[in-house]
Amino acid sequence: MHIGCKYRFIAVMVNHVFQRHKIRNFLKFFLFIVTVALLFSVGSASSVEKPRRGEDILLDTYHRNMAKLETSSFGLPLILESFERDDKVHVDVYGIFDYSFSSVVNMLKIPANWCDIVSLHPNIKACTYKELPGDWLLTFYIGRKVYQPLEDTRQVIYHYRNVDQQRGYLDIILSAGEGPFGTKDHNMRFEALPIDGGRTFVHVSYSYSDSVALRFTEKVYFATLGWGKVGFTVTGKDSVGNPIYIGGPRGAIERNAVRYYFAIQSVMDLLRYPQENRFSMRTSKWYDLTSRYRKQLFELDKKDYLAFKAKEHKNQMTLQGSIGAGLQ
């Protein structure tokens, strides 16, 4: 029906109602129509799906993956997913810590503790923290896996954000606009929520973006010097039935995410020991955890790794001391 015809029809009907009924009845009829209209509008608004909270999404992820966590190929409750799309590489690691949610929150909500975590990575030569008005900065000093003085490293500045902290949910993000070697939009995220048995379900994700030029360089690297460096995702089987693992940027980001996951676990495992003993214990613990996955994570002999980290830790403490004294 044409719109003009609709309006004329409505006018005729209203006039008909008005003529046949008293004004009071007409007003009742009018109020009825308004009420129905409001009910429909409210119903339509409520039918629009609200954005899901991070806590709900993480809890749903836990329930959907309970069986996978119990039968994980890692040999412990740990699963990994990754993707590579356009200029972005992303990985998610999910696992279970045998520690209470409150103990996880108390450790990770302190920005300085993240330097103890990330500096376990072989490529992180030092990490410092600094508080600014309304912001925390974590500076990663990135270099080769062997020992390097700090002046030979690349600095990447991360912003620490405690996005959400509730009684039953924690969400922390470390973000850097510019990364090493032309990468950008680096985001490390940590989520946690309590589950049964006094344990904590955790999520560690990492992502970054790169450029076309960097993609070409990466392909050359992984086809030559980086040949044989693989991640954890199985893409098929070889002629004798052995698994073929993902390589390239996805393989690299999977390795790094698992290293950071085990770094968090190592720090958590040693909180019960005196502060002065923790550094040497957590470097040894981290090495032992990662050495279970030699194909993906082996880089250095344990003796060399511990020696390099001991030197790097001294450099880190000296640098952090100068920042605390206002010299940096």
Show the residue positions of the predicted features.
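Terminal, regulation- and interaction-focused segments at domain boundaries
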Residues: 80-107, 128, 245-252
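N-terminal secretory signal peptides that target proteins for export/translocation
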Residues: 1-26
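Ser/Thr-rich, low-complexity intrinsically disordered terminal regions
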Residues: 59-65, 109-146, 164, 169-172, ...
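Sec-exported extracytoplasmic/periplasmic mature domains
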Residues: 106-116, 265, 269, 273
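A short, structured loop/turn motif at beta-sheet edges
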Residues: 98-101, 131-134, 160-169, 191-201, ...
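Bacterial N-terminal signal peptides
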Residues: 30-41
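Glycine-rich portal/gate segments that line the openings of hydrophobic small-molecule binding cavities
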Residues: 123-187, 209, 290, 297-328
